[in-house]
Swiss-Prot record:
Belongs to the prokaryotic riboflavin transporter (P-RFT) (TC 2.A.87) family. InterPro entries: ECF_trnsprt_substrate-spec, RibU. This is Riboflavin transporter RibU. Keywords: Cell membrane, Membrane, Transmembrane, Transmembrane helix, Transport. The gene is ribU. Its main location: membrane. Residues 1-9, 57-58, 105-107, 183-189 are cytoplasmic. It comes from Staphylococcus aureus (strain TCH60).
Amino acid sequence: MNGRRKLNMQQNKRLITISMLSAIAFVLTFIKFPIPFLPPYLTLDFSDVPSLLATFTFGPVAGIIVALVKNLLNYLFSMGDPVGPFANFLAGASFLLTAYAIYKNKRSTKSLITGLIIATIVMTIVLSILNYFVLLPLYGMIFNLADIANNLKVIIVSGIIPFNIIKGIVISIVFILLYRRLANFLKRI
């Protein structure tokens, strides 16, 4: 019975930690920074960092849960734009799954950095394709913006690609700075 109680306690602590990371990620969605020379609707926030912390501490399912909860809460509180949270979830999921897949085989600083670089590239490609075929046409349809459909290539090349590269680099740097300091603490909670 004592072993079962200890296992339940560990599972509860893990669930609480994932919940806290989800809450932190949600709060971070409200702290946004515009990137000069890019369209004003493309703003940078650090809400993917808690998802990455959850992924690299507890595994990819935990990271996906944090990203999903963050974006569901963001949608429920913004009550308007379903496309933004959906795109953010896809960006975060493609980023964290790629980074973790590369890192998990050889857990080293080099594989971590390599994983984050490749994750930035994958996220940029995934979001460029999704924006071209799904997200931007959906925005155009929902908000009745005909200009979007006529300028997809320009929007992708001059906005989406540079934004996702910058986002991947910034998120990676912040994550690297925090991960080494917080990983052991998060595992002990």
